[in-house]
Each structure stands twice: as structure tokens, then as C-alpha cells.
Amino acid sequence: MPKYYCEYCDIYLTHSSPVGRRQHNQGRKHISAKIEYFQNLLREEGITPQNFLGFLGSQAYNNILSNPMMNNFMHGNYNGYMKYNPMRNYHHSNRNPNYQHSVGMHNNKYSRAGYVPPGANKYPNNNFHNNKRISNTPKPYNNYTNKPITNSPYKNDKQDYRNNNENSNNFSNYQMNKDNSNFVNKNSEQPN
């Protein structure tokens, strides 16, 4: 098996396994050699920190920000282990289209935890955490008497109050009427 050559350090690795390569790539000599390589490359191109963004142009900068993986690097979330453990510092983007990302809000007085700007609702409506019923279907039991809720005071006691579907109520009424009629017919027959 051929030995692994590192072009930044200009050496052949004695351990060319993936573990040996990883250890070499995380070493301080390799990192400093890589930094020096790219600094020399930028120096040869005539790129200085003052004209760096002008050299990239607005299109290149916008393309970097449109890539969600590059956003991790731009926000200072770069991790040296990203290549080998990509989910370690990955922050999921908010999928809410009305969400406004607060870039540079750390110096703003509105960014303090618990601070509510003037005129804002201190207790916003939240359907998940409040106790209001969202659906219009009635509760199966009354809160005060703990008895089943009825739509009419003349309903049969055998009706299933848990199912408020009109079709099933009609069917259950039909079944009860049928059972009651059979019961009456059986009792009306008297032996001679």
C-alpha cells in the first residue's frame, strides 16, 4: 500500500491508515503549514485583507451565504472535527418563513432575555400552551356536574355521548328503536 503524501508538510506519512491521516491533519505542524501555504498563495495573487472582499465580488459572497453549510462557517461555528463528525455543531435553520434572523442583535437592547419592547404583547397568544380548546367539538362531560353533555333534554339514556357524529347518532337511535320495538312485540305476545 503506498504511503500517504501530505503536500502541505511535504512529507510521507509513516502510518497511512485513515486514523493516521486524521491525527496528522489535526496536528499543529500540519495546520501551521496549511495556513502558511494559503497565505503564500494569497500573497502571490496580490490579495491583501483590504481588497479581499473586492476580489471576491458580491456574487461570490452571496453564494457563500446561500449555502446552509457555509453559514455554519460564517457564524463562527467552524469545528476542526466537522469533516469527521458533521452533526456535532450543526444548527438547524428555522423553517418558519416569518422568522427574522437576528444578525448582530447581541449589541441591541432588545436582545436581552425576558425584555419586551414597548408596545409588544407581553403574553402572546400561544395555542399550544394555553388552555383554550381549538376545536368546536364539545367536551364529552360537563365541567360542573361531571354528567354527559346532551344536545337535547329528551335523548335516550343508552346513546353513546362520546360520538357526536350525526350519522352515527341516527344509526344508534335506529338500533335502539328497533330493539325497543322487538321488546314490545315480544311482551305483547301472551300465550293462550
From Swiss-Prot:
Alphabetical UniProt keywords: Metal-binding, Nucleus, Ribonucleoprotein, RNA-binding, Zinc, Zinc-finger
Q: Where in the cell is it found?
A: Nucleus
Organism superkingdom = Eukaryota
The terms under GO molecular function for this entry are: mRNA binding; pre-mRNA 5'-splice site binding; U1 snRNA binding; zinc ion binding
- The primary location reported for this protein is nucleus
The record's annotation in InterPro entries points to: Matrin/U1-C_Znf_C2H2, Matrin/U1-like-C_Znf_C2H2, U1-CZ_Znf_C2H2, U1_snRNP-C, Znf_C2H2_sf
GO BP terms: mRNA 5'-splice site recognition; spliceosomal snRNP assembly
Q: Using the UniProt annotation, give all residue ranges assigned to the region (Disordered).
A: 118-192
Q: Which GO terms describe its cellular component?
A: commitment complex; U1 snRNP; U2-type prespliceosome
Give me the stretches of Low complexity compositional bias: 164-173
Regions of biased composition (Polar residues) lie at 133-154, 174-192
Name of one Pfam family that matches: zf-U1
**Which residue spans match zinc fingers labelled Matrin-type?**
4-36
Quote the subunit structure annotation: U1 snRNP is composed of the 7 core Sm proteins B/B', D1, D2, D3, E, F and G that assemble in a heptameric protein ring on the Sm site of the small nuclear RNA to form the core snRNP, and at least 3 U1 snRNP-specific proteins U1-70K, U1-A and U1-C. U1-C interacts with U1 snRNA and the 5' splice-site region of the pre-mRNA.
Q: What does this protein do?
A: Component of the spliceosomal U1 snRNP, which is essential for recognition of the pre-mRNA 5' splice-site and the subsequent assembly of the spliceosome. U1-C is directly involved in initial 5' splice-site recognition for both constitutive and regulated alternative splicing. The interaction with the 5' splice-site seems to precede base-pairing between the pre-mRNA and the U1 snRNA. Stimulates commitment or early (E) complex formation by stabilizing the base pairing of the 5' end of the U1 snRNA and the 5' splice-site region.
UniProt-listed PANTHER family: U1 SMALL NUCLEAR RIBONUCLEOPROTEIN C
Protein family according to the UniProt entry: Belongs to the U1 small nuclear ribonucleoprotein C family.
This chain's protein is named U1 small nuclear ribonucleoprotein C
Its source organism is Plasmodium chabaudi chabaudi
